[in-house]
Amino acid sequence: MNIFKKYRKSIVISSVVLASIVVIILVLQLIIGSIITNKIENAIDKREDNQYKITVGTVKINLFTMTLILKDLNVTPDSLYLKGLASKSVKQPDILRVKVPVLRIRNISILKLIRDKFIDVGSFVLKNAHIDVYTDGKTITSKDKKPKSSSALFNFDSIPLPGIGGGRIGALKINEFGINLINVNKGDTIVSANSLDLALYDVELLKNENDSTSFMLKLKDVDFNMSNETFYLPGGNYILSFKDMSFSMNKSLLVFDKLSIKPRYSRSKMVSLSKFQYEIYNVDIERIEINSIDLKQIIRESKFFFSSIDVDNMKLNIFKDKHFPFDESKRPTLPQQMLKALKKDLNIDSITISNSELEYSELHELMKEPMIVTLGNFNVKVKNITSVVDSMINGVVMTINLKANLQKTIPMEVDIAFPMKSIRDTFMFSGYLGKGEMKIFNPIVLPAIGVKFESGIIDRIDFKATANTIYSIGSMTMLYHDLEGDIQRKDMVETNKFLSWVANSVLIQNNPIKDNDPRTVPMYFERVMYKGLGNFLWKTLQSGITATIVPTMKSKVQGQIDVTKGTSNKDIRKREREEKKKNR
């Protein structure tokens, strides 16, 4: 008690002083808050741009925690400005509508800001913000395009910010951010995302030594997350969705869980969108991991270098309606041609697809049901995917290894090698097919050559070939026994019994024939230039199959090879005549 009396006066004085400080701080908060509000309002009023209306609900400042709070910040486009976006005939700049319920800037260093013009902030927190981006859907014509000064997506090494001495943000967090991309001409939402989370850590602006008004951006880490989002892909005919997407700059890892790409419309409507036949895709993927992503390299240099892309448990369905004609004006490129034509540097050490399934189906005019080919237990390894010129000059070879079970039962393997240095884009492919019933080929060969296998066993098929962008040449050894087949009528439903009897009398029913060595036959196919790699490979193999089972086809295929190589009897006689003329 005596101690309390002794220090009573000091305690009272301290309490009064502390209370006074609190009152002063509270008064200052009101004053500073009012000043900041007036500054913001004046800045908005002085804007010369009348295309947007900017409003702020309330401004608060907490001097105890040095926190600035902005509530109900809205950026609204003028109605006439928005209406004019759809009426212009050429590409117009996109228009934004922004809603920010709450923006918190915490731990602001006032002293550094006043003394050094250095922006030092503990955290920048944005919650439940939403942006609508309105676009006219038009593309920029070549004459409207401005030349880029460099290949960088954005120059983070030279950010112009005159009037400040630098900056640091401990953490920039954007939570539950939403964005819509809206085509005003079609009244269609192209992209919609409503749960985007972004976190940037230790964001620094470092002044460039050779330019006092520009800064270099440094980031310690970036975390980016999205959940249950849906997007329309370019063209508007497919929808991309995923359950979760996450990116970590520290881990250099981008992950998608339960990703799918689906047609936007029914199959019949998708088919009707073109007057030509084309592939319709439907994809479900359990998980995708993209490793060793260097975000700084992508932004600064536009170089996309990844160590691996791993795709697990993919279900890929491809459908084509062959009632429609081919688009003969198309010129699909082969994989190595596509990489050589890239304008950006791309390098992926490996792409792995595992535990997957591919189903390809075609609906033919003369067949009631679609032809379906299924590759079960589908596993693919692609190595050395690159568009880097130095790598190509040094002789890098891109390789593809595919392992699967044809129609889910017969084991098969295909290897393809693309020497990227090849001037003629030469490539090689080889592989095998294991033991199974010949009937398994019916969905493939019936629409192609009108033959339906009734019995027979494939013991093994081995093949190898060399190809370029124009033709392929190779060889096949197809071992089988007890082959019998039917020749189908034009409607592909009924059997032509007479032709089937003739065919079975002529077809080579066993390879090897008893007491003979196995027949190895040539393969040849001249590429149809408006079709892709898959058709090129299959037609090459088809030439080997027909050359094996049909006696006359072996000499026909060999004749095609001789003509291509210039070694046919006709070519030899022509050269002999030319030599005789020279010697006269």
What positions do the PLM features span?
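Single-pass alpha-helical transmembrane signal-anchor segments
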Residues: 15-27
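Short secondary-structure subsegments characteristic of cysteine-rich extracellular domains
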Residues: 124-128, 309-313, 459-469
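Terminal hydrophobic membrane-targeting helix
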Residues: 24-133, 169, 177, 182-186, ...
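Flexible, surface-exposed loop regions and adjacent strand-edge segments
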Residues: 138-147, 324-331, 449, 491-497
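Elongated, acidic membrane-bridging lipid-handling scaffolds
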Residues: 4, 13, 17, 117, ...
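Extended terminal
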Residues: 2-17, 415, 419-420, 432, ...
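Sec-dependent signal peptide cleavage junction
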Residues: 2, 37-45, 142-159, 163, ...
